[in-house]
Amino acid sequence: MKKLILSLFFLSAFTLRGSAQLQGLEVVKVPEAQQPYSGEYIYIPDVEGYKTLKCDFHTHTIFSDGDIKPENRVWEAAIRGLDVIAITDHIEYRPNKDYIKADHNESYKRAKTVEKASNLIVIQGAEITRSKPIGHINALFLTDANALDVEDPLRAVDNALEQGAFIMWNHPGWPNDTSTLYNVHKDLIKQKKIHGIEVVNGFEYYPKAFNYCKEYGLTYMGNTDIHGVYKQTYRTDKQSGSMTIVFAKERSQEGVKEALLAGRSVVKFGDILIGSEKNLLSLVKACLSYEVKEVKGNQALVKVTNKSTLNFEILLDNKAGTILGNATVEIKVRLDDKVKFTTTHITDDSRLVIDIASLR
């Protein structure tokens, strides 16, 4: 119905212009024909006093092997409804370098020019791009990406750390569909030189990497690794791009960095949520509110309101159900029962489970 009304509005506007006397006019402007895309709407409430920020920490531009300018990459992120974007062009792989001549800081500098207008936090990063076993490594919160352009990848990591960088091991299952934790990664983790793992990259995720995050206390990360145009890459009517949800003390670059180093993140991939038990529990409790309508013995009727746009798949009393975003449902429960959130992942074989009694 809205589309029909809008179409009739446009038709009437253009008809009026067409029927009006045009003789002698230089230009006829039709501003009502311009309807800017309003973007994706993903609402997740703040969690336990922290600011909930939607982030993409892995993106590319024409300054490495991406298809669009850094400024446009930032505007795409704004349209996606993100709060934070990191520009992480490849250090070693720059197929456009013959006709786009610039150093490794230029893409961030250009992205930074639209930070204020876009209302995003723009972070400088870079991707150390080597073959396995070390693979690809993102360094975030850099001050000089040129310092990473060295022969030894371990020296590049150290140079990033000297700038106070957050180090993320990218897409561990790419390109050979095997998420092996090599000795080089174990050594870097032991030395506290890897802080997080990208458990989701673009259209795939790596269940073994969930286990690595839990075992070693690393931050769960998920990003698009976008190279092309976002609207040509993602069917946003089906699923939005993957993102890292960060719980920050403040909405600032410093706040984001502190949160990542502290491990306060959950990864969103469609309706799948991946993170530590603590962070998943905090997120679910922030999104869902409960009201006990009536109690009869060990049975209760509970009204559940989902304040977020996230959809939660649950298993309760061996029955599957869905709590849709921005919806309210009434559920009959036993007070000694447990509810499993089946689209959450802590490890490859563990989900978030909550005692019903703890929700009262």
Could you describe each region identified by the protein language model?
Residues 165-167, 220:
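Generic beta-sheet signal
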Residues 12-13, 68, 99, 235:
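Alpha-helical transmembrane segments and their juxtamembrane interfaces
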Residues 172-174:
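Conserved catalytic scaffold of divalent metal-dependent phosphoesterases
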